[in-house]
Amino acid sequence: MANHFRTDRVGMEIKREVNEILQKKVRDPRVQGVTITDVQMVGDLSTAKVYYTIMSNLASDNQKAQTGLEKATGTIKRELGRKLTLYKIPDLVFEKDQSIEYGNKIDQMLRALDQKD
């Protein structure tokens, strides 16, 4: 059970630090509008699945952001190594967060039902 708390704490710390690194250290214009929404850690802390969102809904912008994040992974890991006191910095896997789009779709459906009444 204590290991679960550790993975949650490490995930929260990585989320905070990656957001800061993206804002201050990464100069790639493809990742300027990226916000980290969640980080899920594997139990042994070897891999961190980093969920992100961007303001644009264009598929080309999504692909550019994904490519920019993949290119910046080395810089992000290096900065995490400087800021975190972990034995091994986890491998970062970036995935677009679909939950916000899903929530917006549900919200639109509820509004449409509300307008019918």
From Swiss-Prot:
Subcellular location per UniProt equals:
Cytoplasm
Pfam families per record: RBFA
GO cellular component terms, alphabetically, are: cytosol
By its UniProt entry, which SUPFAM superfamilies does this protein fall under? Ribosome-binding factor A, RbfA
Entry keyword annotation includes Cytoplasm: yes
Q: Which InterPro entries match?
A: KH_dom-like_a/b, RbfA, RbfA_dom_sf, Ribosome-bd_factorA_CS
Annotated GO biological processes are:
maturation of SSU-rRNA
UniProtKB keywords: Cytoplasm, Ribosome biogenesis
Q: Which GO terms describe its molecular function?
A: ribosomal small subunit binding
Signal peptide interval: none
Which coarse location class applies to the principal site listed for this UniProt protein? cytoplasm
Summarizing the function annotation, the protein's role is:
One of several proteins that assist in the late maturation steps of the functional core of the 30S ribosomal subunit. Associates with free 30S ribosomal subunits (but not with 30S subunits that are part of 70S ribosomes or polysomes). Required for efficient processing of 16S rRNA. May interact with the 5'-terminal helix region of 16S rRNA.
According to the record's subunit comment, the protein's assembly and interactions are:
Monomer. Binds 30S ribosomal subunits, but not 50S ribosomal subunits or 70S ribosomes.
NCBIfam families listed in its UniProt record? rbfA
Q: What is this protein called?
A: Ribosome-binding factor A
**What's the name of its gene?**
rbfA
